[in-house]
Swiss-Prot record:
Transmembrane regions listed in the UniProt entry: none
Record's keyword terms, sorted: Kelch repeat, Repeat
Superkingdom assignment: Eukaryota
One Pfam family of this chain: F-box
PROSITE patterns tied to this protein: FBOX (PS50181)
Organism placement in taxonomy: Eukaryota, Viridiplantae, Streptophyta, Embryophyta, Tracheophyta
Domain F-box: start-end pairs: 1-50
InterPro entries, alphabetized: F-box-assoc_dom_typ1 (IPR006527), F-box-assoc_interact_dom (IPR017451), F-box-like_dom_sf (IPR036047), F-box_dom (IPR001810), SCF_F-box_component (IPR050796)
Name the UniProt record assigns to this protein: Putative F-box/kelch-repeat protein At1g12170
Length: 364
């Protein structure tokens, strides 16, 4: 058989479309490939093309669940090696994806958080050492910088003179990977109850759903890591009293999407809304349009995670528990609905999941 040498540009185009797990194995194939996989241009071009999947974690294990959207629709589940020291129990552990990196925060860690890329098996611990009550919030980056400049945000509560009768003060703390240090900021978020597991990172900024306990309004807050300020992104056109907490995700890598479903509804309708325009700082009001409505019977206690794939005929993919509390992946394409139950998961007391885009971005 004649040995064919492909043009290097064609080799790159092919490798852009290879899943990260396979690429990490290819590092030992040739030195040129290994060098290529470490270049920023390749990492960024690969991230643009890679398809989202789901991360699934139980009380003791973590899995990746990729979804095949071809004609033969199926899922592929792999157990991921745990490269986070001291993490032997995932209960009350939260993972927030940020361009392929995972921000890991657990209630059992005292003022500690981890940044993790499971595909590169890289982990970095971040610790807050000041004598204040402290809560980690999430990770983002300065989108105006070529090297992104990743940062972590948290908030602290303290008493200036440490006297019981003195008032408590709140400070926003920002960790910069470039300096490996913390700084305090005089910036604050709007009042409201932050809904757990609602964080989404988009173009470096962090977004989450907040509800007002008195008016039952739901709105989206954000933190701009470039300007290091909080913003009220928008008020959602429905309230928390009538609907489950909205579930956030991204859309087309430059917009937000929301999953909306009614409480105690007579129907199983689930609505998916997306922002009409790209997210930017033009100051224009945020407009939402309905992307699709689907009828799926799921558990009333389920917290779905989802993503939208425009490559395969406007596909909506959701992971959640069905009406029998069995964890399933749902694929909606046009009028066709495919339900695939996730089996073989070791989940004694706890199970959770989120959508995630795997990448070759190294931990900063």
């Amino acid at each position: 058989m004649m040995h064919v040498i492909l043009p290097w540009e064609l080799v790159e185009e092919i490798l852009y479309r290879v899943p990260p797990l396979s690429l990490t194995r290819f590092k030992i194939v040739c030195k040129q490939w290994n060098t290529l996989f470490k270049s920023k241009s390749f990492v960024n071009n690969h991230l643009v093309r890679v398809r989202p999947q789901f991360l699934l974690w139980t009380d003791s294990k973590m899995y990746s669940v990729s979804v095949n959207l071809n004609d033969d629709q199926k899922i592929d589940m792999r157990e991921l090696p745990l490269d986070i020291p001291y993490l032997n129990n995932f209960m009350r552990t939260y993972f927030t994806p940020c361009d392929g990196l995972l921000f890991c925060d657990s209630w059992s860690w005292r003022k500690k958080a981890a940044i993790w890329n499971p595909w590169l098996r890289q982990t970095k611990w971040i610790e807050y050492s000041k004598e204040k009550t402290f809560t980690f919030r999430g990770i983002g980056y300065d989108s105006g910088r070529p090297d992104k400049g990743h940062k972590i945000i948290g908030s602290s509560i303290y008493n200036k003179r440490k006297l019981i009768e003195d008032p408590l003060y709140r400070s926003v703390e920002i960790y910069t990977f470039e300096t490996n240090g913390w700084k305090s900021m005089n910036t604050f978020s709007e009042e409201g109850e932050i809904r757990p597991l609602s964080d989404v990172s988009l173009n470096g900024n962090l977004y989450w759903v907040v509800s007002n306990g008195e008016t039952h309004e739901c709105f989206i807050e954000s933190f701009d890591f470039s300007k290091e300020i909080y913003k009220c992104f928008c008020t959602l056109p429905w309230n928390y009293n009538s609907f489950h907490v909205p579930v956030l995700s991204t859309f087309r890598k430059d917009r937000l999407s929301v999953l909306k479903r009614k409480r105690m509804a007579e129907t199983n309708n689930i609505e998916i809304w997306v922002t009409k325009n790209k997210i930017n700082d033009d100051g224009e009001p945020v407009a939402w349009i309905k992307f699709m409505t689907v009828s799926i019977a799921i558990s009333s206690n389920s917290s779905p995670s989802f993503f939208i794939d425009n490559v395969y005929q406007k596909s909506f993919i959701m992971c959640c528990e069905d009406e029998n509390n069995k964890l399933c992946v749902y694929i909606v394409r046009g009028n066709a609905l495919t339900k695939i139950q996730i089996v073989g998961v070791d989940a004694k007391n706890y199970i959770n999941h989120c959508s995630y885009v795997p990448s070759l971005i190294p931990v900063p």
